[in-house]
Each structure stands twice: as structure tokens, then as C-alpha cells.
């Protein structure tokens, strides 16, 4: 460990591992350290022994749940958008050679006490039970505008300036009811809350197009998921880094960030060893004095022995409960997966519920999600702070990632990756097709 590196990375969360892989490919000498004995941090997938050690220390796991190795339990309910930024990064870096993906079978939204499939295009909107006949026509016209809008053709604008007109005013122009606005804004554009309504319409249109293009890629739903769990993602990028010379040290305590007299970080101490580097990346847990809390998340991991009710017995689903449907300020997300994803034994299913904490009783806030699951075999819940760095890292050369957030996908995470990459290198991350490993 007593060597000099270009970059030291602390923690093997997905943000850290993507950056480690990208910087290694760029020719940087990278040392990657994690205090845990497993990859992934908050993006990890744990076996049963690890799961019980984290949530119920000292308690033995039930033998009835089968072999440890048959379980890969995610800590967060996230899926990849099939046409999203993380998927593109995986393809361009050739990390897809290490990871096999399976499509999520259905995308649902909670409305008026029941769940229904989210329409992915104009034709599905016409068949949706979420809307009345006349509302379906209005929704179809709105989605046609989203799809047909062209910057170079004013005839497609429909008297809408997407950089000036708010999304609220656009919905009003098309005469869409509040319930329809809910599933478009929250189940298609995937917003956490209603702040987007007051903002210009461009971003919402782009988000709906991402949803639609992701569905168009494979059909059924816009989401894909790695076999053996989300923990495969950081491990895939760690392998990329290692192939390009990166050094990995798991189960390695980090005792101190070492700074020079000018306050700039120069290395990391573990015991009596010091590794030096020009730049340091890390998750918030390694920089407690340099981050602030911006909220809290409550999550529940539930083991079921049946599919989630009212989802056509599908092996995998996402369910979004829009805030207004349960008188909240933030949505509730449910990710459901099963043995076909190699994350649990046959006959079992996993459902993970998540939302942003709004009250003094966080567990009561996920109750609407729990009600949709039916009988639960085991459940594990916890509340976590959401952290973000207080500075951009350019002065002290400590580049800190944001906590894994409440969104149901990875688009915000890749925004953080791109932002940190630019601050560290001074250049935008440009995705160039990497040579295939066998070609090198």
C-alpha cells in the first residue's frame, strides 16, 4: 500500500466503481479501498448471513430459507432504464461482458386504490384502465405532441415554448386531469415530487421520451436488471479497473485522510501504512465533516413466497405510488424481483419499498406499499440519511459522491459520475467505444 497513485478511491459503491473504471481506462494509476469485505456499499447485494448481520446483529438466519449462496438481496430498489445513461456507459466500456441482464416484466402505478399498467406510448394510453374514454384521447394527443415535437419545425410546437412554459401550463393546455398528470409525471417522467410542475417543460418531455424509448427497446417495461443483483454493477466496473491496472483492497480500514500544510489531500492512512495520491474520491461515509444531510430515506426489504398480488403473477415489477394518491409529498417505490433473476431460491420473491421520510414515524410511511405485497415471510427495514458534499472538491482534491438517492433508476447517479469526472479532469466524459478485451 505504501506507494504513490494518481487517484485513491474510498468505498466500492456504484458511483465510486464507475469512476474507478473510467479513470483506469484513461491511464490513471488507481488504488481502490473499502472497509467492508464485500463490493457495493449501499449498492450491494447481500447473502442471507450478511443481511442478518446488517439488520439483526446476533440473530441466526432461519434454516428454512435455504442456502446462503442462493440469495443476493439488494439494499436499494433500483432498476436500469434500458436506454438510459448507465446502460450506455456499460455498453461503451464493455462491462456488459461480465454482466447478464434480464428485462423487468411490468411497470405499474397505484391509482384510486388499485394498481394498473403504465402506458408506454399513445396506443397503450388508449387501452389504459387508468383513464376515461375522453381522457384517453386527451392523453393520446399529449403523448403525440411529446413524440412529434421537433426543434426545427415550429408546426410541431402546438403554441408551446418548452423552455419557457411550465409543465403545469402544458398539462392544462391539453386538458389533462390531475390523476393523469400524476402517472405521467411520476410513473413515466419518474419525478419524486411535484416540483417539476413549476419548471419549464423541456426536461419532462425528455424524461418521457427516455421512458418510451426504453420500452421500445425490449417491450413490456423500460427497465432491465442484472442477474445476481445490483451488486454485480460495481463489481463489473471494478473488474474493468483491475484489467487496466487498478489495485483493489477490501476489508481494509481507512483511519485517516492525510492533508498537506496547504489543506490539500495527499493520501490515505490505514494503520501504519500511507498511500499517497494527487486526488481522492470517496462516498460520504469516509468524509463525515465534508458532507451535509439533505433528507432521510426509509427502506424495507421483504421476502415473499408469492408474486406481488394484482400484477398478473409476473416475476418482476416496478410499482410507483404517486404522492397525491396517499396524501404525501414524495412517491413510494416498490421493486419486485424473483428467482428468475438468481437473487433468491425458487418459490421466493423479493420486494423492496422505499420513500423519502416526511414524519417522525418513518415505518408508517411505507405502509401503503406493504399493503400491496400481501403476506410477508421476513422483512428488514432501516432509515438512512441522504448526504451530499458541501464543496466541489477542487480546493482540497477530495471528490465526494452523493448518497444513493430515492429515485427508482440510476440516471441521477450517472449525473453525479459525469459531474465528478469533469471536476477532476477538467473535461466532459465522452463515451468512446472501448476496444473489446479480446482485441487488445
UniProtKB/Swiss-Prot annotation:
Keyword Magnesium listed: no
Keywords (A to Z) from UniProt: Protein transport, Transport
UniProt keyword Protein transport present: yes
UniProt cross-references to Pfam families, sorted A to Z: GDI
InterPro entries referenced in this protein's UniProt entry, alphabetically: FAD/NAD-bd_sf, GDP_dissociation_inhibitor, RabGDI
Gene: gdi1
Protein name: Probable secretory pathway GDP dissociation inhibitor 1
PANTHER family: RAB GDP DISSOCIATION INHIBITOR, RAB GDP-DISSOCIATION INHIBITOR
Family: Belongs to the Rab GDI family.
GO biological process, one term: vesicle-mediated transport
GO molecular function per UniProt: Rab GDP-dissociation inhibitor activity
Highest taxon of the lineage: Eukaryota
Entry's Gene Ontology cellular component terms: cell division site; cytoplasm; cytosol
